From Swiss-Prot:
Domain of life: Eukaryota
GO cellular component annotations of the record: plasma membrane
GO BP terms: response to pheromone; sensory perception of chemical stimulus
The organism of origin for this protein: Mus musculus (Mouse)
Protein name as catalogued: Vomeronasal type-1 receptor 53
Pfam families xrefs: V1R
UniProt-recorded Gene Ontology molecular function terms: pheromone receptor activity
Length: 310
């Protein structure tokens, strides 16, 4: 029997995964609510606020889908049919890919927004949101096509006893693909993800280099009156770098665990750990925005104050 089929017996993994999903859903919901309220309350809303709300919505949908899948992993209330398996697994894989795309494009949009007037990126500022939206839609279509094989490789197979079938949930299993089909889908996905991470690193490096030059110029002009307080641009760049570094570390760790899982024949512990690691970014990233953006912090404080005074 496939070892991952025993995943539902691990209470610690069950508690950890459901806790992660619950916290992530709550944090992303708060972030979406805060940004939507600020967008509705401002005369000229910033494009970055709209995109962060959309970014959080993507992560919220990912965690909700993962929560539904986790229910069938640990406490199945009824066996799913093949259509339910294929739809939920496909949606989950699509949202995971869109999270990578949204993270990359958020870094690019932030870089364009914070770039100085003398930068070559200035010409993209007025239409940056439109360009980012078009790029996201294009990547969405790509992910939908690259993940289409799941509709033929995911089946409802409750009594999993064959070694060549890979466990997904208590109801769903993955049929092994031929080497040609596997390569046909995995190679384009690997290239696309490498390009997105490379673009993310390039945008982060650009902002670090720009702020380093800006700091040197400020030190040259104001050697005797330097302020230790970080500027909004510096705080935003720190947020970018923190999110990007955290995402890349988790992405690499996810790949390492995945290959280890394949090597050790799909062990239940590695499978559970991989699920937790792959959804950690969606849970932690909203807290980074909430803690680093003063506008969100002040808004949440004012909301709490109003609730207390009622």
């Amino acid at each position: 029997m496939n070892k991952a089929n025993l995943l539902h017996t691990d209470i610690n993994l069950k508690i950890t995964l459901f806790s992660e999903v619950s916290v992530g859903i709550s944090a992303n919901s708060i972030l979406i609510f805060a940004h939507l309220c600020m967008l509705l309350g401002e005369n000229r809303p910033k494009p970055i606020d709209l995109y962060i709300a959309f970014f959080s919505l993507t992560q919220l949908m990912l965690l909700i889908t993962m929560g539904l899948i986790a229910v069938d992993m640990f406490m199945p209330w009824g066996r799913w049919d093949s259509t339910t398996c294929q739809s939920l697994i496909y949606l989950h894989r699509l949202l995971r890919g869109l999270t990578l795309s949204a993270t990359c494009l958020l870094n690019v949009l932030w870089t364009i927004t914070l770039s100085p007037r003398s930068s070559c990126l200035t010409k993209f500022k007025h239409k940056s949101l439109q360009h980012i939206s078009c790029a996201f839609l294009f990547l969405c279509v790509l992910y939908m096509s690259f993940n289409s094989h799941l509709f033929i490789s995911i089946i409802a197979y409750p009594n999993l006893t064959l070694e060549n079938f890979m466990y997904v949930t208590q109801s769903c299993s993955l049929i092994p693909l031929s080497y040609f089909r596997k390569s046909m889908f995995s190679i384009p996905m690997a290239i696309r993800e490498a390009l997105l991470i490379g673009l993310m690193a390039l945008s982060g490096g650009y902002m670090v280099a720009h702020l380093w030059r800006h700091k040197k110029q400020a030190q040259h002009l104001h050697r005797t009156s330097l302020s230790s307080k970080a500027s909004p641009e510096q705080r935003a760049t720190r947020t970018i770098m923190l999110l990007m570094s955290f995402f890349v570390v988790l992405y690499i760790l996810d790949l390492v665990i995945f290959h280890s899982r394949m090597k050790f024949k799909d062990g239940s512990i590695l499978y559970g750990v991989q699920i937790i690691v792959s959804h950690s970014y969606a849970t932690v990233s909203p807290f980074v925005f909430i803690c680093t953006e003063k506008r969100i912090t002040n808004f949440l404080r004012s909301m709490c104050g109003r609730i207390v005074n009622i």
